[in-house]
């Protein structure tokens, strides 16, 4: 019998020491020491010796706890009754250290990458260079590649998150520290203008220390919009055009007779300001603010780049001869100061026309405008054509090199960003659509009780209405606040499409989509606001309708719903009008909350297989949109591995995925890191589309059958926990979920409805609360029991069954990804600290009943991971993360202890502003340190 004894289990709360070469990590540790020393000096100078000595004592004791030299209860006693005015600087010190440690780790990853490249080591998986090498070996023909990459799109979609609330000042300061540490890593002691790097670091860390990390007021959607847009100027404006251009050139060089990637492959998106599901704060004004701010940001970028180009392209007509097209373009500028500088005059014409465009489409006017009274550009394509004229002319007189830098990036940028910057998705819950459509139908006299109709009659009625051009209601209709609000939001979306182009609002996503009528109801609402017309031979539908299948049951039924949608001739004409593309979104968060980690992941995989089959049989092109959170419990984990883990046919040259929370800052705040992450998305998409990456071959069906069984067992185990009497009370008492809702964290309510049901709780607070309390339950619970039961069930021997699972781990990217992501969560969990949170549960019997189940399953899951993978260490396959976890654990320790202490005070009535601020600071500090907490 396979032994699951304590001998192979890590003790709860133990640090799993990793075998990491000290030589490789010494530069990173040196960077951390440097930043930590400067932070300590700043703390002493600003807060005095008493606070410094206390922070240093806490740091030393934290390391002693990790080495098991003292008991955790000793550390807890340090904070019991600690004056809040001393607790706050301790929290701030360790939170700041987490930010600075993140900087050091990011710099070290770059350092190691360059070392490996310089040493001529094999290309790293997830890099485009490695992907091109794999494609070269595959010897694919042009027709296959051209067909597979038709309409290829990789779209990271930025979404709001309550813990990613760093103020712009903190963001900018952290970026400056990163730039300085990069110079330091390159061996410099001074900046380009001769200033001491260490002195500049001290200045920036002092600024950071004297700047509030969090806002006192509740985060507004306008703040979240600004947070999302900051990443464009930080990195994306430059990196996305670079990657798009390089990928297109690389693929066309390999298959020159195929017309590949006619459009940009990387196309960013956003939900911030368009996601209304459970968030009444998203109104028509917010949609206008989101789309208008995005347009302002991109037009301002273009104007600034054109101004730079005017300074750079100073060639004189006395020395070069331009093309007739360039001369014609320049002729519209009569500026005598640059009379013999045709490129400057041409660029001033372009800037003048773009200034007229800004005046036409923007409420707020950006800098660098030029009022020449010229007509505005009606489309981004017109702007691209003028930039092409400049490029073509430069190439005729030996100046192609000058066209290959800023001008090329600007031209490429206009091709992807247009006048809209990023596509803003609309999202709302299907229940809301039903209620509004029922009201519209009743007002129009078409049916007085639509909600009472069975599904087939609903579909018949809605199809008939969609075939009729006239709207259901007019401006004078007396509608409810809900209906007026929903129609106003869509009217604002229609206005954005009119001003900025159809790419401004590309999709409408239906949360909790469970039927064909749920899809058609959205079509009715789009029709009411001028965003859909299916009455004629040429349907108009600039906004695609994307059903979102979220629960495990809905994922199971998704393919049948898609097939029924496509069986409707009217809906099929809408799909044809959109290039035969149909997008379907898959929800990882609610499926996880519904059935647990393993069951949810397998439900998504099975849903993808079925959806791909429907697409193949009906002849449409399927684009899957993955609603992944930052955490493993919400579908997170390394994107490259996650994409390769998709089933055959599921990527199909195109995918979208959400990017959330601290993950956005970790991936896109710096150009080098942003490039690496965007490269990995494109690389995985190309490999999944063009190569056989599943690796199962004829064994696929037997592997699927195993996962069917294990996922069912995992769902049952998870259900036993969440259905334990009193579980909701335990969850609310042993985590900060209540405080997430009551304090100023995010603008969105923590529940979709005003209930205490887990089913109604939003996924982000569910996962965030378990992360803060270091249980990380959504990322692993139920998996250990499921595999243990399956191994014991026969008919093969237990050792044979373990070997079968080990073989799947070796061969199957999906299975390997599931276990690897789970291991990352388990490594960051700490049941010793979780026990401290459990002490907040007043009912001792309830505490023991639930916590003992969690602790037993935690041990069991670590044990089964070891058996299947053969690895003693959870992070044996990810040494970089192993280093990160090991290095930062001692600095997480005091943040968790202080959070428990302050939660106890807050709940006992000590709810003064300082205690609330302390709780908020611990939440943000832990989120920064864990880097993917929600």
From Swiss-Prot:
One of its GO terms (molecular function) is phosphoenolpyruvate carboxylase activity. Keywords: Carbon dioxide fixation, Lyase, Magnesium. Its EC number is 4.1.1.31. The keyword Nucleotide-binding does not apply. It is an enzyme of class 4 (lyase). It comes from the Bacteria. Its cofactor is Mg(2+). GO terms for biological process: carbon fixation; oxaloacetate metabolic process; tricarboxylic acid cycle. The keyword Nucleotidyltransferase does not apply. GO terms for cellular component: cytosol. It catalyses: oxaloacetate + phosphate = phosphoenolpyruvate + hydrogencarbonate. Gene3D superfamilies: Phosphoenolpyruvate/pyruvate domain. The active site is at residues 161, 593. NCBIfam families: PRK00009.1 (NF000584). Forms oxaloacetate, a four-carbon dicarboxylic acid source for the tricarboxylic acid cycle. Belongs to the PEPCase type 1 family. This is Phosphoenolpyruvate carboxylase. It comes from Mycobacterium leprae (strain TN). The lineage of its organism: Bacteria, Bacillati, Actinomycetota, Actinomycetes, Mycobacteriales. The gene is ppc.
């Amino acid at each position: 019998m396979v032994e699951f004894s304590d001998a192979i289990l890590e003790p709860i709360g133990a640090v799993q020491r990793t075998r990491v070469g000290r030589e490789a990590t010494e530069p990173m540790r040196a960077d951390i020491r440097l930043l930590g020393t400067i932070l300590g000096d700043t703390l002493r100078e600003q807060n005095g010796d008493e606070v410094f000595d206390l922070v240093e004592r806490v740091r030393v004791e934290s390391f002693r706890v990790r080495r098991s030299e003292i008991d955790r209860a000793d550390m807890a006693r340090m904070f019991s009754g600690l004056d809040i005015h001393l607790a706050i600087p301790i929290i701030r010190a360790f939170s700041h250290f987490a930010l600075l440690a993140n900087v050091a780790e990011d710099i070290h990853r770059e350092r190691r990458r360059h070392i490996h490249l310089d040493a001529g080591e094999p290309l790293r998986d997830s890099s485009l260079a490695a992907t091109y090498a794999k494609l070269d070996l595959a010897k694919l023909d042009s027709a296959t590649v051209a067909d597979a990459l038709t309409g290829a799109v990789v779209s990271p979609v930025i979404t709001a998150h309550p813990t990613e609330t760093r103020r712009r000042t903190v963001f900018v300061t952290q970026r400056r520290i990163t730039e300085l540490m990069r110079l330091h890593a390159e061996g410099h002691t001074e900046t380009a203008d001769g200033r001491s790097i260490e002195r500049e670091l001290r200045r920036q860390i002092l600024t950071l220390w004297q700047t509030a990390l969090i806002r006192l007021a509740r985060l507004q959607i306008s703040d979240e919009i600004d947070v999302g847009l900051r990443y464009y100027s930080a990195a994306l404006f430059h990196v996305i055009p670079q990657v798009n251009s390089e990928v297109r050139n690389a693929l066309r060089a390999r298959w020159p007779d195929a017309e590949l990637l006619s459009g940009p492959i990387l196309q960013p998106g956003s939900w911030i300001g368009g996601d209304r599901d459970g968030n009444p704060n998203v109104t028509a004004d917010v949609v206008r603010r989101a789309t208008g701010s995005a347009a302002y940001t991109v037009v301002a970028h273009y104007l600034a780049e054109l101004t730079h180009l005017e300074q750079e392209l100073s060639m004189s007509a006395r020395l070069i001869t331009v093309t007739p097209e360039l001369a014609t373009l320049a002729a519209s500028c009569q500026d005598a100061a640059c009379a013999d500088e045709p490129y400057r005059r041409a660029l001033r014409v372009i800037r003048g026309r773009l200034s007229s465009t800004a005046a036409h489409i923007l409420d707020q006017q950006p800098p660098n405008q030029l009022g020449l009274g010229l007509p505005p550009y009606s489309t981004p394509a017109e702007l691209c054509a003028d930039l092409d004229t400049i490029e073509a002319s430069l190439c005729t007189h030996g100046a192609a090199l000058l066209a290959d830098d800023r001008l090329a990036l600007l031209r490429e940028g206009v091709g992807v960003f247009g006048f809209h910057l990023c596509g803003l998705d609309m999202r709302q819950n299907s229940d809301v659509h039903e209620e509004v459509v029922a009201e519209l139908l009743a007002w129009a006299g078409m049916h007085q009780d639509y909600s009472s109709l069975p599904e087939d009659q609903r579909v018949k009625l809605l199809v008939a209405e969609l075939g009729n051009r006239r709207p259901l209601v007019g401006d004078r209709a007396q509608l409810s606040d809900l209906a007026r609000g929903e129609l106003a939001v869509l009217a604002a979306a229609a206005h954005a499409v009119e001003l900025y182009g159809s790419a401004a609002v590309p999709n409408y996503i239906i949360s909790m989509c469970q039927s064909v009528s749920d899809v058609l109801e959205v079509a009715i609402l789009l029709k009411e606001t001028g965003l859909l017309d299916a009455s004629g031979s040429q349907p108009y539908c600039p906004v695609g309708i994307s059903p979102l299948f979220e629960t495990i049951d809905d994922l199971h039924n998704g393919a049948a719903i898609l097939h029924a949608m496509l069986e409707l001739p009217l809906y099929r004409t809408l799909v044809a009008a959109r290039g035969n593309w149909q997008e379907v979104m898959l929800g990882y968060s609610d499926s996880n909350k519904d059935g647990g980690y393993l069951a949810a992941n397998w439900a998504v995989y099975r849903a993808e297989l079925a959806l791909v089959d429907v697409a193949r049989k009906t002849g449409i092109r399927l684009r899957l949109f993955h609603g992944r959170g930052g955490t493993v419990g919400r579908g997170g984990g390394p994107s490259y591995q996650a994409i390769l883990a998709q089933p055959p046919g599921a990527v199909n040259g195109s995918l979208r995925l959400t990017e959330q929370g601290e993950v956005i800052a970790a991936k896109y705040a710096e150009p080098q890191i942003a490039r690496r992450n965007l490269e990995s998305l494109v690389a995985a998409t190309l490999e999944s589309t063009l190569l056989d990456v599943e690796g199962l071959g004829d064994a696929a069906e037997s592997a699927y059958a195993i996962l069917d069984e294990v996922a069912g067992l995992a769902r049952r185990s998870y259900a036993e926990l969440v259905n334990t009497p009193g579980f909701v009370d335990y969850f609310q008492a042993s985590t900060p979920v209540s405080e997430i809702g009551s304090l100023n964290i995010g603008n969105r309510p923590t529940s979709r409805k005003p209930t205490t049901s887990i089913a109604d709780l939003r996924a982000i607070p569910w996962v965030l609360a378990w992360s803060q309390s270091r249980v990380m339950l959504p990322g692993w619970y139920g998996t250990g029991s499921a595999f243990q039961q399956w191994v014991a069930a026969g008919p093969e021997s237990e050792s044979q069954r373990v070997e079968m699972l080990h073989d799947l781990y070796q061969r199957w990217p999906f299975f390997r990804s599931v276990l690897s992501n789970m291991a990352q969560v388990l490594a960051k969990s700490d049941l010793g600290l979780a026990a401290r949170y459990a002490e907040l549960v007043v009912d001792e019997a309830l505490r023991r009943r639930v916590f003992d189940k969690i602790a037993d399953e935690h041990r069991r899951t670590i044990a089964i991971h070891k058996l299947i993978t053969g690895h003693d260490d959870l992070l044996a396959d990810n040494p970089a993360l192993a280093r990160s976890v090991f290095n930062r654990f001692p600095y997480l320790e005091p943040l968790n202890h202080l959070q428990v202490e302050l939660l106890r005070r807050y709940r006992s009535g000590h709810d003064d502003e300082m205690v609330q601020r302390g709780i908020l600071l611990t939440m943000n500090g832990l989120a920064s340190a864990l880097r993917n907490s929600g």
